[in-house]
A protein has these predicted regions:
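Bacterial Sec-dependent N-terminal signal peptides
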Residues: 1-31
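Lipid interaction determinants
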Residues: 21-101, 112-173
Length: 173
């Protein structure tokens, strides 16, 4: 009888530990859809002008035909190629946590992205853009953690680049 109670207690403790250590991953609100359009070039990346004056940084966005997007914020002086696109450690970390990876959709001249933030697997952010032409778009709205909303007029420009990182991720369905 005592042995059965001990086994039951150990089983309960192990169950609680396993539940506590599991990763809760937020689902993206947007669905991944293949991108078949020509509204944006996808054979490279887009980089923004400097943003957030108190913290000199800029954004880099990458799009794929399978509907996956990557959006990364870098500090001024960092290289999009060296510190992001060709940095295997960063890419591996981005896919395993997840952060910065997500999906996008285009409707007429509007671009919408939803990407993981990476803080505890539970958060995503959405950003909305106006497409100017196939090599330029402007961020208009950004919705962050817990719905915090900010408005921008941040211009992104295209730079041809190859090879882009692989876009597969277990967190993108």
């Amino acid at each position: 009888m005592v042995a059965k109670k001990a086994i039951l207690v150990v089983f309960c403790i192990l169950s609680l530990v396993m539940i506590g250590c599991s990763k809760v991953v937020a689902d993206l609100g947007m669905q991944r859809k293949p991108y078949l359009g020509t509204d944006l070039k996808i054979d490279g990346y887009y980089y923004s002008e400097p943003m957030w004056k108190e913290k000199e940084s800029f954004a880099v966005a990458v799009f794929y035909r399978n509907g996956v997007s990557m959006l990364v914020f870098l500090e001024m002086g960092q290289s999009p190629e060296r510190d992001f696109l060709l940095n295997e450690s960063f890419i591996s970390d981005m896919k395993s946590k997840p952060h910065s990876i997500g999906v996008f959709s285009i409707n007429s001249h509007s671009l919408e992205m939803e990407n993981f933030i990476g803080r505890g697997f539970r958060h995503t952010y959405k950003s909305y853009y106006e497409i100017i032409n196939d090599s330029t778009f402007v961020m208009k709205r950004f919705i962050g953690i817990e719905g915090s909303e900010s408005f921008h007029n941040l211009k992104f420009k295209f730079k041809k680049f190859s090879p882009k990182p692989d876009s597969t991720s277990v967190y993108i369905r």
